[in-house]
Amino acid sequence: MTKPQLSYFKVRALGQFPRVLLSYLSIDYDNNYIDKIDENIIDDLKYGQLPLYTDSNGFKLVQSMAISKYIASQHDFVGKTPEEKALVDETLAAVNIDVFTFIIRVFRGVEEKEKIQEIIIPRFFAKWNQILGEKKYLAGGNSYTLADLYVYVAYEYIGYVLPFAADLLYNGKFPHLDSLKEHFESNKGVAEYLKNRPITERKI
């Protein structure tokens, strides 16, 4: 059987969510790094954008969050009850629409970096830290879900893209987020992915 393939640029950005997910779930996949969108791949891109996920059965899917939910749903990683699944969706939307978009806007100079400290950290990261302290898992229940993975990726990513944010977030300031980070990075598949993840000039 053909291995699943994830195609994305040689940067972290939106490709980080499904890459970390596939690694965490120990799915053997082809991590296909793309230099540019050309005629060899454009016909497979419904909206002209990467990432592109090609499953082992030939099914193709674009949009990072849709890809992640599709993979997670195949491996019982989206919550067990309707309430847990709704909380997973709620968290994914907050990460993808609010936090991640804002990080990129600050990185590109569209938003003032002070807003990271004034809005993003107290409204989102502090709240997630609080929930993790109260419930251990962001969607409740008794196991990790895609919600936890998404918050981990955002927590790791913001310090990479915006170094000033690392001083505001890390070093014990949010211990439950630190524990979440430790959980995912101690996973064998994730650790291997992080070890071999390419370093590029485009810090995004």
UniProtKB/Swiss-Prot annotation:
Gene3D superfamilies: 1.20.1050.130. Belongs to the GST superfamily. Alpha family. It catalyses: RX + glutathione = an S-substituted glutathione + a halide anion + H(+). SUPFAM superfamilies: GST C-terminal domain-like (SSF47616), Thioredoxin-like (SSF52833). Residues 2-79 form the GST N-terminal domain. The keyword Kinase does not apply. GO terms for molecular function: glutathione transferase activity. Conjugation of reduced glutathione to a wide number of exogenous and endogenous hydrophobic electrophiles. The keyword Acetylation applies. It comes from Dictyostelium discoideum. It is an enzyme of class 2 (transferase). Keywords: Acetylation, Transferase. Its EC number is 2.5.1.18. The modification N-acetylthreonine is found at T2. One of its GO terms (biological process) is response to curcumin. Transmembrane segments: none annotated. It holds the Pfam family GST_C_3. Glutathione binds at Y8, Q49, L50, Q63, S64. This is Putative glutathione S-transferase alpha-3. InterPro entries: Glutathione-S-Trfase_C-like, Glutathione-S-Trfase_C_sf, Glutathione_S-Trfase, Glutathione_S-Trfase_N, GST_C, GST_superfamily, Thioredoxin-like_sf. Residues 81-202 form the GST C-terminal domain.
